[in-house]
């Protein structure tokens, strides 16, 4: 699987749901907690096309978006190919990487 980064805060239920889904898929990820970290949140927003909500999920260089976006990929059967480096459709409306 390719590298996965997820920006979170401690008490965010959507962050916990995203981590549960990724863990259920057997995906290893790096969690970046931006609780009380203005620089970390600014870095996240810069990478996430201005989005400031958490979670923000990146699979390789692909910005997936938040939990709803991750769940939509799973529902459409596109999450496993993305996690395995076979992104043909692009995530979050972006171009395929």
Indicate where each model-derived feature is located.
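Non-catalytic, surface beta->alpha helical segment in thiol-disulfide oxidoreductase systems
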Residues: 59-88
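Short acidic DE-rich linear segments
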Residues: 90-97
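Structural micro-motif
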Residues: 49-58, 68
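Structural signal for short hydrophobic segments within the conserved structured cores
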Residues: 30-32, 62
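Residues that form or flank phosphate/diphosphate-binding pockets in enzymes
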Residues: 16, 39, 65
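Thioredoxin-like thiol-disulfide oxidoreductase module
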Residues: 34-52, 78-85
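Local sequence-structure signature of Cys/Sec-based thiol-disulfide redox active-site neighborhoods
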Residues: 1-30
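Short, glycine/charged-enriched secondary-structure capping and boundary segments
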Residues: 20-22, 45, 70-73
């Amino acid at each position: 699987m390719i590298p996965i980064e997820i920006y979170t805060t401690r008490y965010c239920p959507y962050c916990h749901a995203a981590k549960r889904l990724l863990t259920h898929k057997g995906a290893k990820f790096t969690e970046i907690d931006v609780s009380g970290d203005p620089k970390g949140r600014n870095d996240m927003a810069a990478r996430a096309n201005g989005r400031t909500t958490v979670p923000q999920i990146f699979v390789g260089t692909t910005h997936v978006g938040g939990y709803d976006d991750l769940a939509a990929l799973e529902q459409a059967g596109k999450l496993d190919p993305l996690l395995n480096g076979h992104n043909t459709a692009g995530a979050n409306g972006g171009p395929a990487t």
